Amino acid sequence: MVFDAEQFKANLTARLRRQYGKDISQATKHDLFDAVSASALEIIMPNWMETRRQYEAKPTKQLYYLSAEFLMGRALSNNLINAGIFDQVQEVLKDMKINYDIVEDEEPDAGLGNGGLGRLAACFLDSLATLQYPGNGYGIRYEYGMFEQHIENGEQVEYPDNWLRHRDPWEVKRSDLAVTVRFGGEIKYGKTPDGQDRFYIENAEEITATPYDMPIVGFGNNTVNTLRLWQATSPDGFDLQLFNDMQYQRAVERQNNAENISRVLYPNDNGPMGKELRLRQQYFLTSASLQDLIHHFVLNVGTDFSKFPQYHVIQLNDTHPVVAIPEMMRILMDEYNVGWDESWDVVTKTFAYTNHTILAEALEKWPIETFKNLLPRIYQIVEEINRRFMFEVRGKFPGDYAKQNHMGIIHDGKVYMAWLAIHACFSVNGVAELHTKLLKEQELKDWATLYPQKFNNKTNGVTQRRWLLSSNPELAEFITKRIGHGWETDLMKLKDLEKFADDEESLDELIQIKQNNKDKLANYLKHSQNVLIDSDTIFDTQVKRLHEYKRQLLNIFHIMYLYNRIVEDPNFNPPARTFIFGAKAASGYRRAKSIIKLINTVAEKIVSDRRVRGKLNVVFVENYRVSLAEKIIPASDVSEQISTAGYEASGTSNMKFMMNGALTLGTLDGANIEIVEAAGKENAFIFGLTADEIIKINEEHSYNPQKYLDRNPYLAEIVNQLVDGKTYDKTGQLFRELHDSLVFGVEGQRPDIYYILADFDAYVAAQEKVAKAYADKKGWARKTLINIANSGKFSSDRTIEDYVRDIWHLKKTHIN
């Protein structure tokens, strides 16, 4: 992109003057961030407009990625780097006596996602634009994100993530493209105003969906794709009559109900109202997005919908947007008078589905009454899809009534969204080799028998532009100095680093880069959280969504083990470690919140005990998010990837850590298996039961956690300390549910369903291997270099090329 320094200065000062009535000397940090971002957007805008123009001038097949979340992180540095103007902007700001780092730190993380699902979507958008494929995202513009996590008295407390308090300078509101989404109402059949016999809805609640567009800037080219986010409002808005009647609450009731749809990501759904709000969100996203797509198709191509799959492929990111399938049927049949068979043909050639989990709880299903009341016409269509599908199932599995019932899209009083997706989509992919194998052989075995041609694997990836080039500039420079440029868009080139594995100078430099990053993180935590950590210790890190299967509890048990050993045995002298945690627990997930409380309680005990000072430290990083990950990951020595084998679909933090030279301590789960295959077992620390072993134990019902407590007094002591009324909690009740979930089982489940006690000894042994390996500085550095050199497979660029080859069949569009 062309950069004119004087024009940039003029735009920046003009923005300050017009927007805030200030000059640079009067501007606040936020004013400067807004002005710098707006001025950068001015440079990006011509390419953004030209990208859209070329896509429309010569219609070509485009990907549309529907996702409940996009965990974008900060936009400023990423966009400047991808646009190739990062250094120039820094230089101009320096001339203007503006500190770029202060400007960058003023940007909030976009509150559009939470975990790996959303971060994957963000990486995919980056790769699509960089590889010059026509691909855009559709999501919801959440006003308050999921939540901002504060730790108070060791416990997670949720506050609104008010990331839009100042508006986002990177978004462009498109009121001209607003659409109406309808809920409820009564189904009618008869003549419409144009004389056609169709189904239609009367007395529906109408919600206005207004799009806000964000630019997705490709690296080193002119492509700027779009992430379109929908905001919900009421077309009626404020009721002045009710207000004048002094009914103030009722005057804004409709407005509030509408705006609640795009208020918060993943509202607590423990009750029926929360479930209904989630379904409203999902239908709102899909209906608005499909109306938008179909409107543009009719405008540019016409109403021959048999051509629709030639120009569109829609990827459903997990089950959240699966209601798009019956919604497209509704639009085609009810609004364009297309017949059922023709509509179904379009749907089954357009939609593809990515499965991200084998956890039954995450395969969404909706109570029939909720679904039917909220979306009566959509439910009617799902009923008909299911009726026709059951003929197919009975033909494939005659006489097997249990299987027929289980595979019903509607059964046991619920609508099964994953079943609907697998039936309707032409492709169903898992996200790591093990995950896809388990789907085909275990969780979705019946479906794989019915539709073997649909199932395929696409191992996840991450974008090296954000997770290496931007977040670890010293390491990026180290790489470029040795192998040149090109790795930024072809990460397989990192393989050339292997020839430096025994080069003393390279290993010394790698050690120093890691130390510098550790120093920076220590300094950041000192100033942001008032936490002191020693950057000469091993940084052992587990940062990810808090869930029992991810086994943060196993990690803290090992820390409790180390603490007990150090206190009880003066001769026990392990290497000094700093354990870093970062995680949010879902607001309604009680045991996950208890684990956060336990981590912070143990951390507090350790920091106040002089006997372990300098040997052991635990830090829980508050409000973990992308911008924090960009500081933590480059500084980490050990990457904790310790989920119960067979439960983590893929994971992507494991890839980011590998790319940044942290060694994997993990189970043979998700993408860990492929990481170990790439880097070599000798360059990782693998432990624990395998997925096959766990499947066998589950099938035999042979697991007895008590035997692990009986044979390991250290483990028995740790588990007992949860409830002994003296070590960590005077009442003995604070961690009672965690204790009982391991020893007795809770909520009708058997004890220790995630095999924490079974894997404890192996985990401790693996940690001892980590300690021993770390003592050999050069040997450790060699392992890190080999990990970096073999991380090329885990670029999202490779993942996107796999999707394009096997599923999407897109053609590159070179923007002039």
What are these model-derived regions, one by one?
Residues 1-816:
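A conserved ligand/cofactor-binding region detector
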